[in-house]
Regions:
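ATP-dependent adenylation/nucleotidyltransferase module used to activate substrates
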Residues: 1-154, 195, 210, 228-237, ...
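Mid-to-C-terminal catalytic subdomains of enzymes
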Residues: 139-145, 149-193, 197-202
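Short proline/glycine- and acidic-rich turn/helix-capping motifs at secondary-structure junctions
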Residues: 241-251
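Short, aliphatic-rich beta-strand segments
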Residues: 203-216
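Short, conserved charged micro-motifs
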Residues: 218-225
């Protein structure tokens, strides 16, 4: 099955839209197929501001209206406790809310941007999607992340080379309760460090501070900019370390 065939069979759908590579291409494909695809962005403290800005920018490029739904995820104790299956509880909250809003707008089909490169396995987040009957056209059509990037480039989407970005909650070690302060520190640190030229990196919280993880090609940059990194992160964290084991590229 191709995406065009999928949207011919399913001409109306709500889309969980993050503004990332996958959901951006899925929205573009729906628009190109003449389908009515309504993108919904659920704004929680787990997402940095630039994600919403990218989502709006992409929708403006495609001349599609974006619906933003605010959610204070800190009202969900099963999420902020940060258990190993946090992602399951979080996605279930998000998609339950989204399904209700989409239904009130007249949409019975809910889509997300999971692709064929994502390992479904027993990942907690995938379980939530199955339970709530969320369909993943990119995965169903066999489109891998690499292929989606290439098709996005051909389509002229600015998201084609956007690094994958996991939610800010992943910066907090499992078992450590998530706080707004921790998320704000991680987001601020990553936002400022990106201005130094870092891409596809993480500022992860540790017991006494933070650990900077970069890809192999950026380790030398991290060492060269050590003083700048300390200037940026010292006001936020008492202890700062650099992981000398290179971070795997997101894709």
């Amino acid at each position: 099955m191709t995406l065009e065939q999928f949207f011919m069979e399913n001409p109306r759908a709500a889309l969980a839209f993050s503004g990332g590579v996958d959901s951006a291409y899925l929205l573009w494909a729906g628009v190109q197929a003449g389908a009515e695809v309504r993108p919904y962005f659920i704004k929680t403290p787990f997402q940095p501001q630039f994600e919403q800005e990218d989502a709006r920018r992409l929708c403006e490029q495609l001349n599609v209206e974006l619906t933003v739904i605010p959610l204070d995820i800190f009202t969900a104790p099963e999420v902020v406790a940060n258990p190993m299956d946090r992602c399951y509880h979080c996605k279930k909250r998000l998609f339950f809310l989204l399904r209700g809003r989409a239904a009130s707008d007249g949409f019975t089909l809910l889509l997300d941007g999971t692709n064929a490169s994502d390992d479904a396995g027993d990942r907690p987040g995938m379980r939530a999607l199955r339970e709530l009957e969320v369909r993943s056209p990119l995965r169903e059509c066999g489109l891998t992340k690499e292929r989606i990037r290439e098709l996005s480039r051909q389509a002229g989407l600015f998201t084609w080379d956007k690094p994958s970005y996991a939610c800010l909650a992943t910066r907090v070690p499992a078992g450590r309760p998530i706080t707004r302060d921790d998320l704000e520190k991680a987001e601020r640190g990553e936002r400022v460090l990106s201005g130094l030229g870092f891409r596809d990196f993480r500022v992860r919280l540790t017991q006494n501070g933070c650990k900077l993880q970069v890809t192999e090609d950026q380790i030398s940059l991290a060492l060269d900019r050590r003083v700048d990194i300390l200037d940026i992160l010292t006001p936020l964290f008492p202890e700062i370390t650099l992981d000398l084991r290179p971070r795997a590229v997101s894709d």
